[in-house]
UniProtKB/Swiss-Prot annotation:
Residues where Zn(2+) binds: 524, 527, 545, 557
Biased composition, class Low complexity, residue ranges: 674-686
Zinc finger motifs (CW-type), residue ranges: 515-565
Nucleus is among the record's keywords: yes
Function statement: Transcriptional repressor of gene expression involved in embryonic pathways, such as LEC1, ABI3, and FUS3. Repressor of the sugar-inducible genes involved in the seed maturation program in seedlings. Plays an essential role in regulating the transition from seed maturation to seedling growth. Functionally redundant with VAL1/HSI2.
Biased composition (Polar residues): 584-603, 743-765
Protein name in the entry: B3 domain-containing transcription repressor VAL2
Coiled-coil regions listed in the entry: none
Main location: nucleus
Species in which this protein is naturally found: Arabidopsis thaliana
Region annotation Disordered: where it falls in the sequence: 577-608, 669-695, 743-780
């Protein structure tokens, strides 16, 4: 059975067993007050007293900005600072004026401890501890080092209190810790009375980050070590260190790569440079490195899912809603905040960001930061350019005064401790190792995002310069001059074989004149003058004018140059033109060979061939395993080099299939053309014959007194080409049917005629018989 929770706000008193409960101010028991969603949101936005305690007493105004502050209320105890001369000031004004003092800090055990008012107390506390172990722990464990400083004055009160909560530390200790501590734990008895206020811990270089999610066992709970030692101009204020952002909506924990890396100097610069942000508290939320698609013209910025759900308004429809975001100059932009369903999840984007990114002059690799101003609650969009020089300037070593972490920043006021004696060579080596690792990570963050390298195709245009480099390298190779080659003949071709490898020669320029004569020009290594040599001369890597034995007049560097500066430029240009023409001719030959083999490319990729004796020969292809001989898949059909290995006269199965298909296509094309030509010729001939027949019909002259026979058809016995074509186009079944009907009618007509003739003949015989009988009958 679930227990009923009651809101700790006396004016609310909402009770429920379910729902989202938020954490409020710390109590003496060590727990945090449980607030309902409404009260918790007001507490997180620092307007709790303005909403619920507006009519109560205890309200005072800030001496600097006249902001109303509720004194004596536990919900506003971290929102104000007491002045020594009387009065109160808000935490923002106190931070700007540098009047943040070391007040009483509320520990989780509910006890109040006195604060330290000077650096001498800090020095005395540090004297009672093992400083060697302290430095050892801080330098080896970068996760809990000074670089993990939190800017707690810019965080929400609920998150400030949550950092000190006992149950929160238990939850964090139960989770794995990514950091490995090689030093002892820091929870020693002298530190119990060294507790300081949360706000003064902001610039402490030993500030830990207990809210960071870890992956390995976490050491024992550690309290703040020292306070009041603000490293002005030190390494801590210059390095962009990832800091855990404030708690967002729900319990979503952001990955460390999205943590804001804004520094104290940048916050102060923003407050002083832009007046519209001077009266507001800037809370860094998260940041994102722009990808190529984010900085492109698509106008869409992909947001981390956890960040969008934690700090942006909740949306339930994919269309989203318009979101107003200000840039650091105060200009307001309206973006469409929406999401896309993606594998039972969501991908949140901001659409319409191209004008804003272009106004900031951002590109791929730059970082976009998102912050919130309090108490207005407006979203602010900033940026940080990615420059390689920034990361290098961060880590110049500890020789510079402003980067010496352990010489200026940690020197106590009493001067009893000599920090230089405590740092030995091994500690300095560890410091250098840590700085190198930080430099490497910073370089990884600021690297420019570009297109990934692709595999170069050897016959494509992408490697044109590479191929030229190969040809030039071939020109530099010379046969060794100390040995003589042995010549052997292979297939009517003479080859020179050397026992020693080739050597590199000097690069020369070859020029072809208009007459067809080729010249070789070489530059002296001593004087830089150009000398002309025969084409067949091979030069060593080092050559000077004194080596020019073929031309005694040019065998000295004091001899005048054979080419003027203008002629030298012409020579270089002609040499490049000569190489370009040679490369173009080789490419033309390659294209011609590819066109010639395009028809048989598939046949050349045949897998198997069957010989006359039935033996199977497998061609050299990129056939993958477990495919039997004769497989015709796309992988097995492709030869290793992408070109065919079969001859045009090959009779393998694939080659024959390709040739047969080609012959079939050509035959169909030829038959189609012949049929079209025949039909055109027949049509033209029929038209000509019809005209001739019409013109050649004889005129029938009727004699006087003769009548016209209307049943006669003068053209019935004449046969024309049109009637033949119509008869040929007449369907066969209809023709046979009509022929059968006509035959049947003719047979019936002939049978009727025979029966009629038979009847008439029998009647005539009977009449003749009667007549005969009557003639022979005697008269009675």
């Amino acid at each position: 059975m679930e227990s009923i929770k009651v809101c700790m706000n006396a004016l609310c008193g909402a009770a429920s067993t379910s729902g989202e409960w938020k954490k409020g101010w710390p109590m003496r028991s060590g727990d945090l007050a449980s607030l309902c969603d409404k009260c918790g949101c007001a507490y997180e936005q620092s307007i709790f007293c303005e909403v619920f305690h507006a009519k109560e007493s205890g309200w005072r105004e800030c001496n600097s900005c006249d902001k109303r502050l509720h004194c004596g209320c536990i919900a506003s105890r971290f929102m104000m600072e007491l002045l020594e001369n009387g009065g109160v000031t808000c935490i923002s004004c106190a931070k700007k004026s540098g009047l943040i003092s070391m007040n009483v800090s509320h520990e989780s055990n509910g006890k109040d401890f006195p604060s330290f008012a000077s650096a001498e107390h800090v020095g005395s506390v540090l004297e009672r501890t093992n400083l060697k172990h302290l430095l050892h722990f801080q330098r080896i464990d970068p996760t809990h080092s000074s670089l993990q400083m939190k800017q707690e004055e810019s965080l929400l009160p609920s998150s400030l209190d949550a950092l000190r909560h006992k149950t929160e530390r238990k939850e964090l200790s139960a989770q794995p810790n990514l950091s490995i501590s090689l030093g002892p734990t820091l929870m020693t008895s002298p530190f119990h009375d060294a507790a300081v206020d949360d706000r003064s811990k902001t610039n402490s270089i030993f500030q830990l980050a207990p809210r960071s999610r870890q992956l390995l066992p976490k050491p024992a709970n550690s309290a703040p070590i020292a306070a009041g030692m603000e490293p002005s101009g030190s390494l801590v204020s210059q390095i962009h260190v990832a800091r855990p952002p404030p708690e967002g909506r729900g319990k979503t924990q952001l990955l460390p790569r999205y943590w804001p890396r804004i520094t104290d100097q940048e916050l102060l610069q923003l407050s002083g440079q832009y007046p519209h942000l001077s009266n507001s508290k800037i809370i860094p939320l998260f940041e994102k490195v722009l990808s190529a698609s984010d900085a492109g013209r698509i106008g869409r910025l992909v947001l981390p899912k956890a960040c969008a759900e934690a700090y942006f308004p909740p949306i339930s429809l994919p269309e989203g809603l318009p979101l107003k975001i200000q840039d650091i100059k105060g200009k307001e932009w309206v973006f469409q905040f929406r999401f896309w369903p993606n594998n039972n999840s969501r991908m949140y984007v901001l659409e319409g960001v191209t004008p804003c990114i272009q106004s900031m002059q951002l590109q791929a690799g730059d970082t976009v930061t998102f912050s919130r101003t309090e108490p207005e609650g407006k979203l602010v969009m900033g940026y940080r350019k990615a420059t390689n020089s920034t990361a290098t300037q961060m880590f110049k070593g500890s020789s510079e005064p402003n980067l010496n972490m352990f010489s200026n920043s940690l020197n106590p006021g009493c001067g009893d401790i000599n920090w230089s004696k405590l740092e030995k060579s091994e500690d300095m080596a560890k410091d250098n190792l840590f700085l190198q690792s930080s430099l490497t990570s910073a370089r990884k963050r600021v690297r420019n995002i570009g297109t990934k390298s692709k595999r170069l195709l050897i016959d494509s245009v992408d490697v044109l310069e590479l191929k030229i480099t190969w040809e030039e390298a071939q020109e530099l190779l010379r046969p060794p001059q100390s040995t003589k080659p042995s010549i052997f003949t292979l297939e009517n071709q003479d080859f020179e074989e050397y026992d020693e490898p080739p050597v590199f020669g000097k690069r020369t320029l070859f020029v072809s004149r208009q007459t067809g004569e080729q010249e070789q020009w070489v530059q002296c290594d001593a004087c830089g003058k150009w000398r002309q040599l025969p084409v067949d001369i091979l030069l060593p890597p080092k050559w000077s004018c004194s080596d020019n034995l073929l031309d005694p007049g040019r065998s000295s560097c004091s001899a005048p140059d054979e080419l003027s500066p203008r002629e030298q430029d012409t020579l270089v240009r002609q040499s490049k033109e000569f190489k370009r023409r040679r490369l173009a001719s080789s490419n033309e030959k390659l294209n011609q060979s590819q066109d010639a083999s395009a028809l048989n490319s598939l046949g050349n990729a045949g897998i198997t061939t069957t010989g006359e004796q039935g033996e199977i020969t497998v061609a050299a292809t990129t056939k993958h395993p477990r495919h039997r001989a004769g497989c015709s898949c796309i992988v097995c059909s492709q030869p290793p080099s992408g070109k065919g290995k079969h001859k045009p006269s090959c009779t393998c199965t694939v080659c024959e299939a390709v040739k047969r298909r080609f012959r079939t296509l050509m035959l169909r094309k030829r038959n189609k053309g012949e049929a079209g030509q025949a039909s055109q010729q027949a049509q033209s001939q029929s038209e000509c014959r019809d005209e001739t027949e019409v013109e050649s019909i004889p005129a029938v002259e009727l004699a006087a007194g003769e009548n016209i026979d209307l049943n006669s058809d003068p053209g019935a016995s004449r046969v024309s080409m049109m009637r033949l074509l119509q008869a040929a186009a007449f369907p066969l079944e209809a023709y046979l049917k009509q022929k059968a009907i006509s035959n049947t009618a003719g047979e019936q007509q002939s049978s009727d005629m025979v029966s009629t003739e038979h009847g008439s003949s029998s009647a005539a015989q009977e009449t003749e018989k009667d007549t005969t009988n009557g003639a022979h009958d005697p008269v009675n």
